């Protein structure tokens, strides 16, 4: 293949096919198509691009015209533009629907990130995010895009998609005027997509439907469009078909952001009000706060005031995220950026708080601020007791970045010193545990997760209890309440029965079921949060072969018949194995735990009873038989009275040993039983 030696870049160049290449009539007809209609793959084949309904040419290996667009858009990103030319938007998507890939492509096409610096999941900084394919810590990026010769500033505020971080998502959406609703064209609407769309609608955002992965063989875009219209109620007549991986439809998305998402209100003359949507701890500069200016303006050197925490600081540095931090002189209404003010604790600059000027305070803070409330608790103990100080230091460092993480010291007779930790949900708990083990080289034992119970005492007091060992005695408590959640399950119709059976097993209360498509149903249940902190999600995926998805939200506390189940080994209570269960499940849980302990505890010289008790009542029991020592082996006959004397002496010794003997439960047994507790609860 030969190309013209001199190319005039002002007009699109053309390919000239050699004589050996024109044997095919179809190739001869294409011999004068411009280079912008082709993309050269690594295997050196040329592919014709469909530019009709599927969108623009791929931008993955940017063509000549695409490179010029990126250069024009990416240059001078820091130049000020009128407020009418600012667009703040977010991307809403279920896990694995292509949110991070689309964000990467937007950064690349607008020239925000150069090709040489580009990598997959560019905005996902943590290794854990890349491995799991999820967004944990949200990011923001400022892009410059030229539309009809007019420069626009596009602020992408990335969001975590998981339900554990729904509060952070709501604050991110509150900082935007619009959102891209990204749905996989081969999978359709999923549960967490619905949850975040409802949050966007509550914030009155302009939603642009985007159907991703249209290049997949199993893509059914028309069917998914109908699903979006029926389930969510959005008008999909202007939905955009795209493939973030192949770069199809990216320009259409950028144009739609400019055309359809409204500009921020021009309120630069009002007192400063800025919404914090994220923060993290920098060891050299203190807490770096990401915020959106709603009213007024802020510049370096201003004395700022955090309205929820009541703390004030001087702004040492103000800048924008593009996506790296770049200092600017000031930020005004509608803009998104960061501020460094030598804040020493993330707790002083919480997500959802309002920043204002110390000397000219705003009359009211921005609505929607909430304190992060842990919903799931578990104990973390180092396998090596010498690592306790390291665990404390690691938790303190993590807490600098994660204000939702709570912990307090805890002591166990079996596992030594550790911490009782509170988390937003199960994913949050898994992420913290994995980061402790990976980033701080700690080897940890995790107790069975529990939720926060509300205990009403006979004297009228109400206390919160997350640790079974702190549950008051039955005579002192009037009632116990547990948190309930509303859970929505989206599943193919073939697995409806399996999911309903699972929910009924977990004390679920059926509310409604509706078909959102010909072969997909939405099932609504209310069930205790405690029933979800075990293996509920694993069972959900297992029983539906991975096709079902779920979304849940806490709806409050309800009174339940809850009891404390204790495990006694040789009449001694083992506190770490105590748990709070519903009375109806006490026997099955107790039986499973005692049987597992019988398998794992080494046999002793005396008989060891293993009991599951409610108060003083034993509901399940197993016995570990004694190792028999043959004391008659040395007797080669003789009088029977001699043998009786030896046997009697042995029995007395075993009785004394049983009274004073101590049974040590090995570490492996603890870990296996704690894992079993997570499965059976």
UniProtKB/Swiss-Prot annotation:
* Enzyme class, broadest EC rank: hydrolase
Is Ion transport there in the keyword field? no
Gene Ontology biological process: positive regulation of translation; translation
Enzyme Commission numbers on file: 3.6.5.-
Keyword line = Chloroplast, GTP-binding, Hydrolase, Nucleotide-binding, Plastid, Protein biosynthesis, Transit peptide
Gene Ontology MF terms: GTP binding; GTPase activity; mRNA binding; protein domain specific binding
What stretch of residues directs this protein to its organelle as a transit peptide?
1-51
Where found in the cell?
Plastid, Chloroplast
- Key word Glycosyltransferase present in the record? no
Q: Name one GO cellular component term.
A: plasma membrane
Extract the Pfam families matched here.
EFG_C, GTP_EFTU, GTP_EFTU_D2, LepA_C
Q: What does this protein do?
A: Promotes chloroplast protein synthesis. May act as a fidelity factor of the translation reaction, by catalyzing a one-codon backward translocation of tRNAs on improperly translocated ribosomes.
HAMAP family per the UniProt record, alphabetical: GUFP, LepA
Family membership noted in the UniProt record: Belongs to the TRAFAC class translation factor GTPase superfamily. Classic translation factor GTPase family. LepA subfamily.
The name of this protein is Translation factor GUF1 homolog, chloroplastic
């Amino acid at each position: 293949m030969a190309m013209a030696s001199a190319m005039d870049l002002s007009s699109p160049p053309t390919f000239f096919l050699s004589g050996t290449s024109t044997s095919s009539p179809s190739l001869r007809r294409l011999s004068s198509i411009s280079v912008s209609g082709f993309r050269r793959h690594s295997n050196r084949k040329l592919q014709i691009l469909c530019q009709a309904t599927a969108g623009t040419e791929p931008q993955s290996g940017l063509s000549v015209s695409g490179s010029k667009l990126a250069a024009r858009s990416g240059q001078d990103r820091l130049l000020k533009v009128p407020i009418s030319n600012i667009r703040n938007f977010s991307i809403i998507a279920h896990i694995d629907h292509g949110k991070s890939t689309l964000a990467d492509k937007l950064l690349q096409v607008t020239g925000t990130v150069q090709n040489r610096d580009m990598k997959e999941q560019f905005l996902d900084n943590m290794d854990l995010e890349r491995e799991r394919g999820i967004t944990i810590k949200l990011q923001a990026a400022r892009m410059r895009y030229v539309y009809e010769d007019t420069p626009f500033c596009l602020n992408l505020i990335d969001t975590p998609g998981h339900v554990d971080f729904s509060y952070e998502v709501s604050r991110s959406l509150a900082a935007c005027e619009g959102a891209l609703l990204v749905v996989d064209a081969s999978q359709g609407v999923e549960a967490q997509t619905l949850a975040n769309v409802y949050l966007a609608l509550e914030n009155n955002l302009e939603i642009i439907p985007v159907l991703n992965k249209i290049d997949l063989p199993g893509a059914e875009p028309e069917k998914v469009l109908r699903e979006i219209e029926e389930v969510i109620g959005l008008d999909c007549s202007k939905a955009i078909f795209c493939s973030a991986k192949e770069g199809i439809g990216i320009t259409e998305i950028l144009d739609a952001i400019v055309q359809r998402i409204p500009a921020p209100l021009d309120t630069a003359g009002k007192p400063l009000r800025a919404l914090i949507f994220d923060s993290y701890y920098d060891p050299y500069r203190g807490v770096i706060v990401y915020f959106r200016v709603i009213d007024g303006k802020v510049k370096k050197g201003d004395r700022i005031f955090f309205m929820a925490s009541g703390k004030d600081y001087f702004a040492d540095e103000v800048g924008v995220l593009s996506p790296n931090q770049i200092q600017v002189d000031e930020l005004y209404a509608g803009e998104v950026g960061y501020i460094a003010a030598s804040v020493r604790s993330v707790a002083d600059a919480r997500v959802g708080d309002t920043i204002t000027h110390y000397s000219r305070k705003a009359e009211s803070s921005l609505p929607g601020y909430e304190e992060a409330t842990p919903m799931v608790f578990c104990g973390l103990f180092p396998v090596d007791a010498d690592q306790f100080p390291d665990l404390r230091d690691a938790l303190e460092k993590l807490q600098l970045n994660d204000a939702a993480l709570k912990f307090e010291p805890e002591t166990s007779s079996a596992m030594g010193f550790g911490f009782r930790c509170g988390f937003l949900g199960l994913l949050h708990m898994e992420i913290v545990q994995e980061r402790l083990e990976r980033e701080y080289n700690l080897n940890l034992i995790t107790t069975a997760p529990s939720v926060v119970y509300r205990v009403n005492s006979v004297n009228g007091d109400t206390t919160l209890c997350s640790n079974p060992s702190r549950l008051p005695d039955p005579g002192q408590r009037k009632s116990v309440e547990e948190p309930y959640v509303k859970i929505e399950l989206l599943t193919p119709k073939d697995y409806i029965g399996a999911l309903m059976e699972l929910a009924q097993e977990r004390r679920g209360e059926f509310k409604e079921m509706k078909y959102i498509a010909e072969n997909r149903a939405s099932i609504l249940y209310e069930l205790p949060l405690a029933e979800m902190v075990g293996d509920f999600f694993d069972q959900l995926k297992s029983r539906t072969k991975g096709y079902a998805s779920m979304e849940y939200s806490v709806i409050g506390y309800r009174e339940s018949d809850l009891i404390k189940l204790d495990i006694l080994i040789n009449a001694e209570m083992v506190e770490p194995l105590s748990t709070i269960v519903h009375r109806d499940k006490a026997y099955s849980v107790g039986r499973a735990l005692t049987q597992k302990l019988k398998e794992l505890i080494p046999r002793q010289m005396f008989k060891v009873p293993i009991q599951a008790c409610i108060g003083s009542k034993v509901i399940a029991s197993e016995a570990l038989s004694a190792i028999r020592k043959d004391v008659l082996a040395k007797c080669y006959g003789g009088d029977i009275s001699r043998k009786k004397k030896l046997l009697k002496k042995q029995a007395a010794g075993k009785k004394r040993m049983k009274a004073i003997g101590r049974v040590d439960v090995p570490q492996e047994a603890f870990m296996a039983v704690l894992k079993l507790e997570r499965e059976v609860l």
